[in-house]
Amino acid sequence: MAKTNISPGMQQYLDIKKDYPDAFLLFRMGDFYELFYEDAVKAAQLLEIGLTSRNKNAENPIPMAGVPHHSAQQYIDVLIELGYKVAVAEQMEDPKQAVGVVKREVVQVITPGTVVDSAKPDSANNFLVAVDFDGCRYGLAYMDVSTGEFCVTDLADFTSVRSEIQNLKAKEVLLGFDLSEEEQTILVKQMNLLLSYEETVYEDKSLIDGQLTTVELTAAGKLLQYVHKTQMRELSHLQALVHYEIKDYLQMSYATKSSLDLVENARTNKKHGSLYWLLDETKTAMGMRLLRSWIDRPLVSKEAILERQEIIQVFLNAFIERTDLSNSLKGVYDIERLSSRVSFGKANPKDLLQLGHTLAQVPYIKAILESFNSPCVDKLVNDIDSLPELEYLIRTAIDTDAPATISEGSIIRTGFDERLDHYRKVMREGTGWIADIEAKERQASGINNLKIDYNKKDGYYFHVTTSNLSLVPEHFFRKATLKNSERYGTAELAKIEGQMLEAREESSSLEYDIFMCIRAQVETYINRLQKLAKTLATVDVLQSLAVVAETNHYIRPQFNDNHMITIQEGRHAVVEKVMGVQEYIPNSISFDQQTSIQLITGPNMSGKSTYMRQLALTVIMAQMGSFVAADHVDLPLFDAIFTRIGAADDLISGQSTFMVEMMEANQAIKRASDNSLILFDELGRGTATYDGMALAQAIIEYIHDRVGAKTIFATHYHELTDLSTKLTSLVNVHVATLEKDGDVTFLHKIAEGPADKSYGIHVAKIAGLPKSLLKRADEVLIRLETQSRSTEIISVPSKVEPSSAAREGQLSLFPDEDKSQEIIHTLEAIDVMNMTPLQAMTTLYELKKLL
């Protein structure tokens, strides 16, 4: 970049830019934000705007691109969405009054994790995450700058850190330590995160209170430092730090939440078709965010769950009051984000009107809640602060037709300020005064076409044509001479003009000052507004769950301490909603105290995965306090859910289906307790048949003997059904089918015992494969099944080697040890999956000769 012969203005740009090398610098110049050098070239491509140059005739013209200041936000949004940072440099003085170069300073750095304003507002949270590491444990803090939410926890390993970042759907992660190359690859390439770095811990500890570990303190402190450094102002809306423990909620990895379609449908990445979509009858943006949080973090405290259930039950029992409550909540705006705009000094008159309208609704909401006459609802009533004095201030101060900007005037109501009312009267009546003067002078002078005009240069003046110059009165004084006319003024006109101009200027300045004063007063209420926002959000979510429960005929689940699962006629709530109640086939699920594992067999498309997901969603809904889709439900409280459902390869990281399966299985067996729920669908299918079967059996035995978690294990390995004879806590179930005249009907009902067939060829028929191909598959299947019936299955001990006495009493399949070894080696070398039937028969013949 050539920097010779740089103008003072460009030198100012370069001086500012060197402090923000990792950000696009928007440099305010008049009505535009300009970008220069590499920023201009890159922004022109990304934003699809014109690229020009400064000093075009110079030897080294400077690349330049710009966007209008009034539409800059939409361009900033694009850059942020692409993962970049933007530094905004404003003019800090009036260019007309500046001596030399206009003073400019960066007033804000906008990053993917610190977005407050957006041309496309979204009700979802936007979390900035900070992670620190002390060599043993990780501290993780997160904040939504747009709402003020601020939380911290500590985690044992990087896998947990990754999962929590994914759960928060963060776009930017702030690091206080050096990552390994593998960890950096995971965060940047796999998770598409912007990584930022901060070494300084924020000194003001007013927001950080409570018993925290050192690594939690440093993570939270560095997060605060980064936010203050980028926002460059005191942020009064930031809430006191909340410490949380992962174990205080039902633990689920991001992969588990994705496979269960909790907040978005995994196939479409849209809200539709998710549990969030099903349960969302909220009326406010705050309620939507809280509902998502409840789905993300179901409770493990029975007392807290029952408290939510009780309020939902009260709402269910009072249809009219609940309907009134829902309608009143429709008038509630996003208090959290309005408060943050006040804190950032960005709240406009429309924002305050929305806040005032919300506060006007609060007394009605409070009265409706009181009408339920319920002690559990009264707790919510007691938490509602109506802030009547703030509502009165906004109602009496801000005009209901006020514009969205603070520079256009017409913001403050008439009657709020006497001086402003006087100035407005002068401006309003001044026009009449001028008309009176015009009529009076026209009559006195005899100039019939005499009129008063106005322009910025001459102000108000009498317009006199050349033919009437002889009639001009003596008290007129000349202001300007034109070709065919002259302009005159009078002392009286000048006096009125002075009063009107003063009123216009003073009115605009005074109205701005009054608005700023009102906004400052609103800021003093932010803490109370945030508490009100939390309560209204809770009310909104609870009424939403009541509406959903009534609409879909859900029931109130019960909880037990005896480790039993009883679900009568349960339904997969989301599938039922999509299909319709009439088409959905319910299933009961039962685990007694002695049963820990259900081994489920049956064909694809028959409903095994839906059955497993049904149980998971029922548990999640129950533990978030919701009613559930069933005729009767009695559950233990689970501490975690582990799943492997679905076969999506991790293509970005190069991990195959089988590797992902094994990693998720490892997480489950290492982290699960006897209070956990494990759901494995076709584990082991990603490798060779016997490898997969062996691993599946070993995992089942490990869960049975060492973990004790309630487990549903779906499999195509029918040989595994024999495990029920030696694993006392395992039972076989299968998906029922109906065969008639060669056709197979999947009943989507779970029945006791193992499945007798896989019906894979029937599934292929449904998929539309050619008839000749299906006929050939039937022929091959019959031959393979005939061979299979002539083959003995050898049971392998699962725990420890048998004693020598046991070995002595055990009959040997191959009396001759040498022949045994030869046969074993021959068997190990066989590639069963690639053998023709003829080759299989020949091999079998050769093996028989060795006996």
Curated annotation (Swiss-Prot):
Keyword Membrane listed? The answer is no
* Residues that hold ATP according to the record: G602, P603, N604, M605, S606, G607, K608, S609
Q: What is one GO biological process annotated to this record?
A: mismatch repair
Write down the Pfam families for this protein, in alphabetical order.
MutS_I, MutS_II, MutS_III, MutS_IV, MutS_V
List keywords of the entry alphabetically: ATP-binding, DNA damage, DNA repair, DNA-binding, Nucleotide-binding
GO CC annotation:
cytosol
**Which SUPFAM superfamilies does UniProt cross-reference here?**
DNA repair protein MutS, domain I, DNA repair protein MutS, domain II, DNA repair protein MutS, domain III, P-loop containing nucleoside triphosphate hydrolases
Q: Which GO terms describe its molecular function?
A: ATP binding; ATP-dependent DNA damage sensor activity; damaged DNA binding; mismatched DNA binding
What protein family does this chain belong to?
A: Belongs to the DNA mismatch repair MutS family.
Record's function text: This protein is involved in the repair of mismatches in DNA. It is possible that it carries out the mismatch recognition step. This protein has a weak ATPase activity.
The UniProt entry, under HAMAP family, shows: MutS
Spell out the protein name for this chain: DNA mismatch repair protein MutS
Q: Which organism is it from?
A: Streptococcus pyogenes serotype M18 (strain MGAS8232)
